[in-house]
């Protein structure tokens, strides 16, 4: 901490060290701060300091896996994502879903985790919405989910955007235990302020 007790402007690594030394937070709350690469915002809750997830420029570790407990932005329009303690994508959201203007689909990374026979590379933010073709936006989806249930919702979004309407999206991705194959997608979205929700089993 600074001499006056302030934490303003500290790097993630400095704050992580300070928090551990001061013993004002539990170890698991510090998670991967040394590698986050961002200046942190910190606060207090019930007299105990808390560490918020922060946006990191590079969500991947040296092995090419997503880092745990981070927020990041990716894709053509920098949509928002979060990972859980196991480095699995747990949420993606945007207040302004957009359609890409480029022609043709991007080649995507097919080495996604948790896939079983027949699974597809499920883009959380679809290619037509400028979604990333990398593992920071791809999870294992059943053929039915990818080509039918999820796609039907995406078609609604695309139609609304093409009509000049505003679309927001928030999707929580659920897993079974420590597995990397999603078991459910809890989809919430608005079209010009009208709210819709749907749960899709995978």
Model-derived regions, located:
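Domain-level detector of nuclease and nuclease-like folds
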Residues: 69-202
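Low-complexity, glycine/serine/proline-rich disordered segments
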Residues: 1-91, 99-105, 111-113, 196-202
């Amino acid at each position: 901490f600074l001499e006056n007790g302030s934490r303003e402007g500290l790097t993630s690594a400095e704050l992580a060290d300070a928090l551990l030394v001061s013993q004002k937070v539990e170890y698991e709350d510090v998670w991967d701060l040394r590698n986050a690469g961002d200046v942190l915002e910190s606060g207090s809750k019930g007299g105990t300091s808390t560490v918020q997830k922060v946006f990191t420029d590079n969500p991947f570790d040296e092995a090419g896996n997503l880092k745990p407990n981070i927020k990041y932005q990716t894709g053509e329009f920098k949509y928002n994502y979060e990972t859980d303690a196991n480095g699995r994508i747990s949420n993606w959201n945007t207040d302004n879903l957009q359609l890409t203007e480029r022609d043709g689909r991007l080649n995507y990374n097919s080495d996604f985790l948790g896939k079983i026979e027949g699974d597809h590379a499920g883009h959380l933010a679809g290619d037509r919405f400028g979604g990333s073709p990398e593992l920071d936006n791809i999870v294992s989806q059943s053929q039915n989910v990818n080509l039918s249930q999820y796609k039907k919702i995406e078609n609604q979004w695309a139609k609304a955007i093409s009509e000049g309407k505003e679309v927001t999206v928030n999707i929580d991705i659920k897993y079974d235990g420590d597995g990397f194959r999603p078991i459910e997608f809890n989809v919430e979205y608005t079209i010009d302020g009208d709210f819709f929700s749907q749960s899709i089993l995978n």
